[in-house]
Regions:
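Extracellular and organelle-lumenal recognition/adhesion modules and their flexible linkers in secreted
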Residues: 1-426
């Protein structure tokens, strides 16, 4: 006999589906838990990376003969080419004139970082394929030469771009831009005499991530609403993560170059310099920012280099948190959320989540990260750190990360329950 064989109910976090957590004992399903959470969430995966919900808002991502509209009468033929996934689902676009191809007009959030991507392959003379979004005040498109595999030009709105050679003549071309409206036009245009294959179009908030196939509706992957979270934080074995409702009050939690984050200086200090999306973050994608704080030759507490954001609040206990590392060595920074005393943190070359909990007494509070000189302050004159995932929440401890864009985001409480369990647990 063993504890396992004697047990009337055993739940080993492993089997689950939407709104359900399976129990190992009994095996007839009578003890399975009903799960609910009316919002998306995040979790730590078995590989140690944070998994967020990702959404491809482009419809019919592999069929350009359906939802997609045509511009300047191209000839679009479905399923002519072996796609990067090995299926014959790549479509061919034969352009008939200038900017001839397919387009789609999805709805997006205004003023938010988005990334487009699509796989393309040269068939005939495809040296100037126009790919991108946002045919508005700030254009977010680029020109790609599918013969050479190079981006030749980028429009003013592009903040970053990349090309990945995935083999067999296919390239994944992507670009990042800030939306300037709520409707953007995703374009894949060629020029007269060009023929090229296309497959796997994607548009998503944030930076480019792994491809998500769609048909008649947008598709989200990750810990979506109603899906239980098996979390591996601090362990090689998962646990069923059940958390209370929390709201991240810090907006643009990963986009520190956004105007939602103030940058300031005092005395000999310099305004922090921010380079967006140039480091791999704890979620495994290149969406962490590098921030350089510098107070120059100053030695007093008036010499400050800082970035900040006002988050409101009430008279209560709040917890701030952030992920940070250096490229090499260590650096000291100071953080406060109560508008008063700074907490000092030593940042190393490994990603860590740092937290601070304070009792706040007002309704206009500030998350501030800085270098400040003085007798009782860190004495490094500058610090270069990689930053990601700032969170400010009402509560005495930090919960799992809640990503935000232009507004605060609430993760609804997890709940797992089993009714009529008396026969199982006596």
């Amino acid at each position: 006999m063993s504890f396992y064989s004697d047990a009337s109910l055993v739940m080993i976090p492993s089997g689950y589906k939407d709104q359900k957590v399976y129990c190992a004992v009994p095996t007839d399903g009578s003890a399975d838990l009903t799960f609910s959470r009316a919002s998306s969430a995040t979790r730590v995966q078995s590989n140690g990376l944070i998994e967020k919900v990702r959404t491809n808002i482009i419809l019919q991502s592999e069929d350009f003969t359906t939802t997609w509209a045509s511009n300047v009468s191209p000839t679009i033929t479905a399923n002519t080419t072996v796609a990067p996934d090995g299926t014959t689902t790549g479509d061919t676009i034969a352009a008939s004139g200038s900017n001839s191809g397919a387009y789609q007009v999805p709805t997006v959030a205004n003023g938010v970082e988005h990334s487009f991507s699509v796989y393309v392959k040269n068939i005939t003379s495809a040296t100037a394929i126009q790919i991108g979004c946002d045919l508005g005040p700030v254009n977010g498109f680029l020109n790609f030469n599918a013969v050479t595999g190079a981006i030749t030009t980028t429009a003013a709105g592009i903040t970053g771009s990349s090309v990945t050679n995935v083999g067999n003549g296919w390239y994944r071309v992507s670009g990042t831009y800030i939306t300037t409206g709520t409707t953007n036009t995703f374009i894949v245009f060629g020029q007269s005499g060009m023929t090229f294959a296309v497959w796997g179009a994607q548009l998503e908030a944030g930076v480019t991530t792994d491809y998500i196939a769609t048909t008649t509706a947008a598709v989200s992957v990750g810990p979506v609403s109603g899906l239980p979270r098996l979390d591996y934080l601090g362990s090689t074995c998962p646990k069923l993560l059940l958390e209370p409702q929390r709201t991240n009050l810090a907006i643009y939690s990963e986009q520190f170059d956004n105007a939602g984050w103030g940058k300031t200086q005092s005395g000999t200090g310099l305004v922090p310099v921010i380079t967006a999306n140039n480091a791999i973050s704890p979620d495994g994608y290149q969406n962490a920012d590098t921030i350089v704080f510098d107070v120059g030759a100053g030695t007093t507490s008036s010499d400050i280099s800082a970035m900040f954001q006002t988050f409101g609040g009430t008279t209560a206990t709040y917890t701030g948190s952030f992920y940070a590392k250096t490229a090499s060595g260590t650096a000291q920074i100071q953080v406060r959320i109560d508008g008063s005393n700074y907490d000092k943190f030593t940042i190393t070359n490994q990603w860590q989540r740092f937290t601070l909990t304070k009792a706040l007494t007002g309704t206009s509070n500030v998350f501030e990260m800085a270098i400040r000189r003085g007798l009782n302050e860190p004495m490094n004159a500058s610090a270069t750190i990689q930053l990601w995932g700032v969170q400010v929440e009402l509560g005495a401890y930090a919960t799992s990360y809640i990503p935000t864009l232009g507004a605060s985001v609430t993760r609804v409480a997890d709940a797992a329950s089993k009714t009529s369990a008396s026969a199982l647990i006596g």
